[in-house]
Amino acid sequence: TNHEVNVMLRRKALDEFAAWRDEHGNRALLVTGARQVGKTYLVREFLHAEYENVIEFDLVEQGDVRDAFDAARNVDELFIAISAFAGQRLVPGKTVIFIDEVQRCKEAVTAIKYLVQREDYDYVLSGSLLGVELRGVRSLPVGYVRIVDMYPLDFEEFCWANGVGDDVIAETLRCFEDRKPVFGPVHERLL
């Protein structure tokens, strides 16, 4: 639907989400990163701006859903579990299924390859899938996911969040690269 995302916090990851939306085909979006960097918030805002129907599961908060996903012996049973716990009708071509805290059910990551091949729904997975936790995934379906790693705010994002304009950011970065002091009042504003 290409709506403008109305988020309070401008993040560079949004550009990567939009690129996935524009070209994803048979690929899920897998958003990873440390805890508390804004993954869930940013994904949720993006999806609600882009899709008519958003189904969201939190595998930490929803133990019954996690148990159902864990009990699924194949992709058909996993999809039936998704459908049963969705809480609303799944509309092919208009629904995105967002599975948050996916590190709690590694089989969902492995099964995503088969879910996206069905081509009826879009899938977004999110979680703190760092190093050790990824080792528990039997097979990361590399060709079937677009991985976006999120990090804490970088300098530019921090400036955006504090209302600093792009021209001021560019000048500040130029001063840094040229190893010259930032104009006094601007320096004070940035502090």
Residue ranges of predicted features:
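Phosphate-binding site recognition
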Residues: 1-191
